[in-house]
């Protein structure tokens, strides 16, 4: 379903964009699809060499690539004001991460789109990633349990965002700011 949506949605988009994926494998698959469909796309994730990540990032900044397909490893420190769309191919781990990544679009003040594709199975995938990440942490069993409990709550919060019937911007602002001024 997501692949079909992407194939029909992408031709309608102008300019460059970022597609966020949950895993390195998913990043590779989506990037390969885009290139096969004729879109100049690059990839960015922790499994690539620093040299390849830098080369792909530079190509994206210079508009040599229309789309950057990436995990959340891409984003911090990236200042490309003319990003016209951000698409989350899967559910992000939390509202803060989503808000940060969505904020990559339209920094030049021109219209931009942010789309989040969500299926219930995304929750299970993200829970598995959280559990794996927790296992890798070097801390006490008690600290791991606390970390995982908090991570699960953040995941429930982003799931709640997906089902919100109200203003999504307001939801994000209320969630990320103790006292939003203009919602």
Where are the language model's segments positioned?
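Helicase motor core with emphasis on the C-terminal RecA-like subdomain
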Residues: 1-136
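A conserved SF2-helicase RecA2
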Residues: 122-164
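Single conserved hydrophobic/aromatic residue that forms the stacking wall/gate
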Residues: 175-183
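Functionally engaged cysteine thiol sites
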Residues: 166-168
């Amino acid at each position: 379903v997501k692949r079909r949506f992407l194939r029909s949605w992408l031709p309608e988009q102008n300019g460059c964009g970022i597609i966020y994926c949950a895993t390195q494998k998913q990043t590779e698959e989506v990037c390969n699809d885009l290139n096969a469909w004729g879109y100049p796309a690059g990839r960015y994730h922790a499994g690539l060499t620093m040299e390849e990540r830098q080369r792909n990032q530079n190509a994206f900044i210079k508009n040599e690539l229309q789309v950057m397909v990436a995990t959340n490893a891409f984003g911090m420190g990236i200042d490309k004001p003319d990003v016209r769309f951000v698409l989350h191919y899967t559910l992000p781990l939390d509202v803060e991460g989503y808000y940060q990544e969505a904020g990559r679009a339209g920094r030049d003040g021109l219209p931009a789109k942010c789309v989040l594709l969500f299926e219930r199975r995304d929750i299970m995938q993200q829970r598995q990633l959280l559990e794996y990440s927790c296992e890798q942490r070097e801390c006490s069993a008690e600290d791991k349990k606390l970390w995982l409990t908090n991570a699960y709550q953040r995941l429930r919060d982003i799931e709640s965002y997906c089902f919100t019937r109200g203003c999504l911007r307001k939801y994000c602002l209320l969630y990320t700011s103790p006292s939003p001024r203009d919602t």
